């Protein structure tokens, strides 16, 4: 048996052994101190679920806000779920999602006395363009022609009707609408001469030009018609106003980024929309300036949206703006961001 060596207290070897014994204890104590801090930091991010209907540029605000860290700055972590407006409304009311982003669906639901309200708007004008066969040089030349839309009664028909009204044409008498399904099917009908023109959101204008068609009008240059933003349940407005304010602020920051950072936004659109750079660039150039910088909901556009929704639902009673929108939290968010 090897004899144990004894080292006097205070010797170098004894001090090293004490140090080696103390170090693990220090590390353990440090971990016990820092882990709750890290845990609380992670827990500080509230998880929210946001519904959207389709992968198009006008719904880019909050996904870009997530990617660029604007939601994180507000202590939020979002999950984005693609769903149509019918499912979106149902899951909003049950609390399975927190927000939905198609404002037309929110207005229609509120008019139908579903307890939801718009709290912010990020794209205040319609992004659709009127695209025609090359022989047509103006909107007025479409008098008496067949215009393709996706479905009857949808937003695209509403936008089309208002485009023709803007140019002095009666959409019920001067043109005929034909429901032709998806954009590519309508482009095919245009190529065959079955319809004279159609409407579509980006990148419809880019694709149409590549096929030899011409853009006759951009709806957002003609009138306000709130397209995307945030609406939520009345219950959440009452119970979680601070969370709503943080969502609104993140969206405003994202919109400012979109308007001020062309290259960065094009890259984000490529990734989120799964399109190539050429198409993303054309999409940005078509709609980039359509995003607002303050989250405001234009009153004239909201009134138009209400009237069109009333017609579709055959509702005759007067609808106050306060029935479909609550902008008190938006004003607080704007104030905190220095927006007058």
Regions found by a protein language model. Give the residues of each.
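Secondary-structure end/capping motifs
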Residues: 239-317
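Sec/Tat signal peptide C-region and signal peptidase I cleavage site
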Residues: 40-44
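A bilobed periplasmic-binding-protein/Venus flytrap-type ligand-binding module shared by bacterial periplasmic
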Residues: 64-65, 128-137, 227-242, 290
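Positively charged n-region of N-terminal signal peptides that target proteins for export
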Residues: 25-28
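Short, glycine-/small- and polar/acidic-enriched structural segments
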Residues: 45-182, 186-192, 196-202, 214-219, ...
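Conserved C-terminal helix/tail region of periplasmic/extracytoplasmic solute-binding proteins
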Residues: 310-340
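Pocket-lining segment of extracytoplasmic ligand-binding domains
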Residues: 104-105, 177, 182-273
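Bacterial N-terminal signal peptides
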Residues: 30-39
């Amino acid at each position: 048996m090897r004899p144990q060596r004894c080292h006097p207290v205070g010797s170098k070897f004894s001090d090293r052994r004490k140090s080696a014994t103390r170090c693990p204890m220090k590390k353990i104590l440090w971990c016990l101190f820092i882990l709750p801090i890290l845990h609380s930091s992670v827990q500080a991010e509230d998880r929210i679920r946001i519904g959207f209907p389709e992968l198009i540029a006008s719904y880019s605000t909050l996904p870009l806000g997530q990617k660029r860290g604007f939601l994180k700055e507000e202590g939020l972590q979002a999950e984005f779920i693609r769903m149509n407006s019918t499912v979106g409304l149902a899951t909003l009311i049950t609390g399975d999602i927190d927000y939905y982003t198609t404002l037309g669906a929110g207005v229609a639901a509120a008019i139908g006395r579903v307890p939801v309200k718009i709290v912010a708007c990020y794209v205040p004008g319609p992004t659709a363009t009127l695209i025609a066969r090359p022989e047509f040089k103006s909107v007025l030349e479409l008098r008496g022609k067949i215009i393709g839309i996706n479905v009857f009664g949808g937003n695209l028909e509403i936008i089309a009707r208002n485009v023709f009204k803007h140019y002095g044409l009666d959409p019920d008498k001067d043109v005929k609408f034909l429901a032709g399904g998806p954009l590519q099917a309508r482009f095919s009908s245009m190529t065959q001469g079955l319809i004279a023109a159609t409407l579509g959101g980006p990148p419809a204008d880019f694709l149409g030009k590549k096929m030899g068609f011409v853009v006759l009008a951009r709806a957002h240059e003609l009138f306000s018609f709130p397209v995307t933003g945030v609406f939520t349940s009345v219950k959440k407005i009452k119970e979680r106003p601070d969370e709503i304010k943080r969502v609104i602020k993140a969206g405003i920051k994202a919109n400012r980024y979109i308007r001020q950072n062309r290259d960065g936004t094009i890259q984000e659109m490529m990734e989120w929309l799964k399109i190539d750079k050429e198409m993303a660039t054309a999409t940005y150039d078509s709609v980039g300036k359509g995003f607002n910088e303050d989250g405001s909901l234009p009153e004239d556009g909201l009134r138009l949206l209400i009237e069109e929704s009333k017609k579709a639902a055959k509702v005759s009673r007067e609808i106050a703006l306060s029935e479909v929108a609550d902008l008190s939290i938006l004003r607080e968010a704007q104030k905190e961001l220095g927006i007058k």
